[in-house]
Amino acid sequence: LIIKLKGSDREQVNACSDIISKALHRIRVTITHNEDVQAHEAAVANTLALWADSDEVDFIITSGGTGLGPDDVTPDATRSVIDREVPGLAEIMRLDGFKKHHSAILSRAVVGIRGRCMIFNLPGNPGAVEEYMELLLPIIPHAVDEVQSA
């Protein structure tokens, strides 16, 4: 799920989507949905809830809208639909990112669970998305298994 901010660079949006897709294919994940959503909290929340409540989605990765700007509503939308947060994953993403780029600490990204679906917020910067996907790839299968078996 790509969150499109006002004035988003189409190339950057496409690059983030491609990086996520390629990384997930490496761990043999089938992508069932891929959509751009405008940066409106209700639109993002509705899409997250719809996908998370479907039987065909085990986890959702968002890209974009995690910063401090007025259009950065992804964490707020995510918090409004999740049942529980998984703060350690968001914390490790910020910490890992901070080691390379101090501005990563400003991310408001959230990781949480709705029903039997995990939701991961990633930034909208292709370089950061690539770094965070490398960090998350070994964790996603185990985390999803834990949520699915609950």
Feature map (PLM): residue ranges:
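Non-catalytic beta/alpha edge segments that cap or flank active sites
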Residues: 1-150
